[in-house]
């Protein structure tokens, strides 16, 4: 069942959430991802964005979004599949895979998961144009719902899920 997307409108959370910090470290330990950024009070990277308009505030401003880089695409795909299979348990609101190239496409426009479209693969949209803004980028963008009471609560949910 689809969940309401929690970050429209976005807001300034003032700092990185301890949940997101723990998640980034866990992604590093398990798959070697690197932290490319969590909290940043800025406008979205979107050609339509109007600087200073709250409608265009990046989800990174909430402290609940992160960009995690990788060097091995095969490992990134394993991580994508695992996260996608557990969007409900981990309360993942959104994931962007910028390097995904759809069959028959001439460019890697990416794909995105959003909780309001459904859980797991039901919530994935394959991009056919520059909608995500970073085609071919070697990182995942992940947004976690701000409903976790603590990093410890999130950690327990993570550890309850079998490793891939």
Residue ranges of predicted features:
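Secreted/periplasmic proteins that engage bacterial cell-wall peptidoglycan
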Residues: 1-115, 137-145
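Active-site or metal-binding loop neighborhoods of secreted/extracellular toxin and effector enzymes
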Residues: 116-164
